Amino acid sequence: VRFSDRVLGNAKKFAKQAKILQFDVDAAEINKNIRVDAAVIGDLKEILKRINAELPQLGHEAWIAHILDYKVKYPLTYQEPGLTGPYLVEEIYRQTDGDAIIVTEVGQHQMWAAQYYKYKNPRTFLSSGGLGTMGYGLGAAIGAQVANPGKQVINIAGDGCFRMNMNEIATAVRQKLPLIEVIVNNHVLGMVRQWQDLFYEKRYSATVLDDGVDYVKLAEAMGATGYRATTRETFNEALKAALAAKTPVVIDCVIGCDDKVWPMVAPGADISTAFTGE
């Protein structure tokens, strides 16, 4: 969506073997951060309709097979015991058999949801990508549930994101929507804290949220069912109960504040220098 540091890394090394075509509604963004080979200014929805009509439809079978082979050879793993972000996402996949619509907020939980849930069907992962829109997920989950009343919708949120738009739990209750809100509660703004931990000598600023907010009571105050999970066993039980419920459920999942998302690229580096934390 934007040629920012999160997308480019080292701008001088970005996609050196590719032809770059930039679409943007704002002409001022063209060639702003990188030089492109061609540009189209206008509404992306209309532009893509025209391009799809002109281009041959490619299946990219060889490339997809190559990526699937990499996933087998180099699977994502984690060794941390107890309740962790990756475990939460994997358990959601196990109990839903990959048939849920997964929505995310923004942060570490967003990355874990992309990495550890095995998506079987198109249009079942709703995320704002790199836009950084904390608070997006709950409203998007409500919309997804209204549009798909026969599907299970689960919003995976960090505790920081839940605070941004948690009042919409009351909307879900009022509309009798059986969505599930899974709060990955590490008591910090995890993505920013990870950067502070790795690149700023653990000088933590404005990222600690350990102020005793009780998300279970907040959920109950708005008419939803609330559970708190501190172990794998209690999360498994809470999720099973939530999936059987016919009304909104909030599960407050307490995890450690030092869990990291891997791999990652350091600020100003390029994708070839991504590191895994090992």
Q: What is each of the regions a protein language model found here?
A:
Residues 16-19, 35-36, 97-100, 120-123, ...:
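Short coil/turn connectors at secondary-structure junctions
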Residues 6-7, 11, 232-278:
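Glycine/aspartate-rich loop-and-adjacent alpha/beta segment that forms the canonical ThDP
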Residues 38, 47, 53, 197-238:
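Conserved thiamine diphosphate
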Residues 2-3, 111-189:
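Thiamine diphosphate
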Residues 1-66:
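Glycine-rich, acidic loop regions that bind phosphate or pyrophosphate groups
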Residues 68-144:
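Active-site diphosphate/adenylate-binding microenvironment
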Residues 30-38, 123-127, 164, 193-207, ...:
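Short beta-alpha connecting loops at secondary-structure transitions
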